């Protein structure tokens, strides 16, 4: 399966929407988009994974690397998991939890909520 990555802006946040499978083959595409956003000075990023059906360790690696890069620029990274993912356990959420890295990320239910300054993330 291919990966589709779209970029937008909302409320001062760069929004990267990812759809498809985030794996060894497709993770470099996401890494490149995140690096390009940071290089362009966009240090507050919402990574919308609501359309991701599968994520392997390469996908998790790119999420962790993105977090590290953005934090090094004093930016913020917010994730959107598939519908009800943080509550009921989407594939992406289960992988992040199984690897013990879910707690590293601020997860929100949707892009609109993530792009608001006064919103709190969903619990880990």
Show which residues each predicted segment covers.
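STAS-like cytosolic regulatory interaction modules
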Residues: 1-53, 65-124
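Helical "lid/switch" subdomain of P-loop NTPase nucleotide-binding domains
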Residues: 58-59
